[in-house]
Amino acid sequence: MHIAVVGLSHRTAPVEIREKLSIPEQTMETSLQTLRGNDQVLEVSILSTCNRLEIYTLVRHPERGISAISDFLGQHSGLAAEDLSPHLFNFHHDEAVAHLMRVAAGLDSLVLGEGQILSQVKKMVRLGQEHKSMGPILNRLLTQAVSTGKRVRSETNLGTGAVSISSAAVELAQLKLGQAQGEDQLMTLESELVAVVGAGRMSRLLLQHLQAKGCSGVMLLNRTRQRAEDLSADFPELPVECRPLDDLNHCLSTCSLVFTSTAADDPIVDASLLKQLKRRSFLRLIDIGVPRNIASDVVDLPGVESHDVDDLHEVVSRNQEARQQMAKEAEVVLQEETRLFLEWWDSLEAVPTINRLRATLEAIRAEELQKALSRMGPDFSARERKVVEALSKGIINKILHTPVTQLRAPQARQERQQALRVVACLFELDPPLEDG
């Protein structure tokens, strides 16, 4: 068995490629079942965010397993192998484990140390458990990754003042407003007519940061108006006008700054739509949805400026240098957590021998107990039989405790294998079945 990860991220692929591989929650079960149906895949879980799509697996054979996952991604995206493969990465065993720890800690994020990725890893664990695509190995690995992410944020300064995709989007709007006025600095949004399209988690964060940056009011649109009203109720100090998504044309005609973050599979704004509108002002669009909510053809229109998640690099790079030093603190934690998991993984090599040893001793115990009880005669009560049986089981457990602990203890693989051979020889244990 081998742990492997195959995927792509903002580091390896532009948004126009990433959006083709995005797997929304409503189709996650189907994707997991498809992957689990491959005879190479023993366990699987999927991390799908606006900046990455990563498939973590336990496979029978590393090369064949990685090939099977890559084939799935090609079929899912509709991209030819020559178009997709340059953007894919894959890691095997210790590199896969170390990569996941970095992801959960926020060290592989566009926004270094951002906290939202930890929630997304937790969601990956929940979906994998709900859809029963994970087994003991990935359960252990992903649960430890979540713990590692929490530990990094509590034991280092990396999480202090960390920005998110949403806060970076608001800063990008401030920066572009300043640049339009000939200033290379963040400008207030107080005079802007601002709209947010969507009422999910990213939109909640947008409202939070817009309020913090002095925004005077927001038009909030959502397919379900009630959800927009529920969200706006959490921001009593920010004037929010809730509207249904059907009012999108009105929003685009009247607002000067529009953020989009919906779960739509296709763009909800394109050039043909904007051409039909009588806009009152310059329109700045900032799209943090993946798949994208704003079609790329709008950039050719006069009076329209459009940005997507890949454009956030411009503001992220302004505060990354200071955070790089904080990341070095986190690396120490990641190395320790990776080592702990790999030690646990190595200890699994002893499990078949331990199980066969336990079964051998249990058979001896049961046989000898039966002989003893048969000699006791009918005067030996049921209660006394239970006491003797418990005694025999306790003796076996005491005998097994020290050798089992030693076989599972961290040690060089060569030393463990030698110890396993000695135990198998001493107790004449049958060899384990080879994994197919």
UniProtKB/Swiss-Prot annotation:
The record marks H99 as: Important for activity. One of its GO terms (biological process) is protoporphyrinogen IX biosynthetic process. It is an enzyme of class 1 (oxidoreductase). NADP(+) binds at G198, A199, G200, R201, M202, S203. One of its GO terms (molecular function) is glutamyl-tRNA reductase activity. Its EC number is 1.2.1.70. Substrate binds at T49, C50, N51, R52, S109, E114, G115, Q116, Q120. Signal peptide: none annotated. The active site is at C50. It comes from the Bacteria. InterPro entries: 4pyrrol_synth_GluRdtase, 4pyrrol_synth_GluRdtase_dimer, 4pyrrol_synth_GluRdtase_N, GluRdtase_CS, GluRdtase_dimer_dom_sf, GluRdtase_N_sf, NAD(P)-bd_dom_sf, Shikm_DH/Glu-tRNA_Rdtase. It holds the Pfam family Shikimate_DH. Pathway: Porphyrin-containing compound metabolism; protoporphyrin-IX biosynthesis; 5-aminolevulinate from L-glutamyl-tRNA(Glu): step 1/2; Porphyrin-containing compound metabolism; chlorophyll biosynthesis. It catalyses: (S)-4-amino-5-oxopentanoate + tRNA(Glu) + NADP(+) = L-glutamyl-tRNA(Glu) + NADPH + H(+). CDD domains: NAD_bind_Glutamyl_tRNA_reduct. Belongs to the glutamyl-tRNA reductase family. Catalyzes the NADPH-dependent reduction of glutamyl-tRNA(Glu) to glutamate 1-semialdehyde (GSA). Possesses an unusual extended V-shaped dimeric structure with each monomer consisting of three distinct domains arranged along a curved 'spinal' alpha-helix. The N-terminal catalytic domain specifically recognizes the glutamate moiety of the substrate. The second domain is the NADPH-binding domain, and the third C-terminal domain is responsible for dimerization. Homodimer. NCBIfam families: hemA, PRK00045.1-3. PANTHER family: GLUTAMYL-TRNA REDUCTASE 1, CHLOROPLASTIC (PTHR43120:SF1). This is Glutamyl-tRNA reductase. The gene is hemA.
